[in-house]
């Protein structure tokens, strides 16, 4: 019996295009939800964006804590769903029929890249379920309790989940941007054009954030910790938007 060949007609192409659009929609919605910390500009949070962690907006003792924790959970689940859709559907970041798609399916880079995005989504969702009990950068009493180890275990767990989220985001950003640069035919998609700059900016913001955290832990001030971390999150969200837009652009070509 002859081996049946996979379908490649108009119906199959339409199905792939629809799947890619859904994936892009999940990523875009996740990026927007992930950026809702910016609403602190309009809300009387009482926390300074220059010196506080973004996670402290969602602390249990903060007036809008439940609101920000809920949005973090939604953001993480949306991005996780998009990444798992890419992995389980054996798709590529930008479709199946392009040079990028053909090259990406032959290697492990897209799998690791999308696994990084999935880790980012899962860890972000976990962050929302492991809230800080108070805002150490704005509350001297909270800081004293934290340094004395007199805070809930969720403080340590939150630090781990936050680190995993950023690590996953960096893995995905670097690898999927590399794939787009290496394999996308001209005219280049937005991810190939803009992705490298966002990756560099994210690395710089991450370095600044780590230095600021070290300074704060050593009692040497915040070094603009709030600004650094907000830039870090902003560049991740912007990259996700670019990825989603590039996926939609590819879907239109199918």
Located regions from the model:
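Short, Lys/Arg-rich, polar N-terminal cytosolic tail immediately upstream
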Residues: 1-20
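Short, charged juxtamembrane terminal tails flanking transmembrane helices
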Residues: 2-3, 249-254
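Hydrophobic, aromatic-enriched alpha-helical segments typical of multi-pass transmembrane helices
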Residues: 14-250
């Amino acid at each position: 019996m002859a081996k049946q060949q996979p379908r490649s007609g108009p119906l199959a192409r339409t199905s792939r295009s629809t799947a890619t659009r859904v994936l892009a929609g999940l990523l875009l919605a996740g990026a927007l939800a992930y950026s809702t910390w910016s609403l602190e500009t309009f809300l009387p949070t009482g926390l300074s964006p220059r010196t506080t962690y973004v996670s402290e907006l969602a602390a249990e003792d903060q007036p809008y804590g439940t609101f920000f924790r809920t949005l973090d959970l939604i953001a993480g689940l949306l991005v996780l769903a998009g990444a798992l859709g890419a992995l389980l559907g054996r798709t590529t970041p930008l479709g199946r029929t392009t040079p990028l798609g053909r090259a990406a399916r032959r290697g492990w880079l897209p799998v690791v890249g999308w696994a990084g995005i999935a880790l980012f989504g899962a860890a972000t969702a976990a962050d929302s379920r492991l809230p800080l009990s108070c805002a150490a950068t704005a509350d001297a009493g909270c800081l004293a309790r934290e340094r004395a180890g007199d805070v809930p275990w969720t403080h340590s767990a939150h630090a781990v989940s936050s680190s995993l989220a950023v690590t996953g985001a960096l893995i995905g950003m670097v690898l999927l941007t590399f794939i787009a640069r290496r394999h996308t035919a001209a005219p280049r998609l937005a991810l190939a054009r803009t992705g490298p700059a966002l990756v560099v900016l994210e690395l710089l913001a991450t370095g600044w954030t780590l230095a600021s955290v070290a300074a704060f832990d050593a009692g040497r001030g915040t070094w603009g910790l709030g600004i650094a971390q907000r830039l870090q999150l902003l560049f991740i969200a912007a990259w996700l938007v670019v990825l989603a837009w590039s996926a939609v652009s590819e879907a239109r070509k199918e």
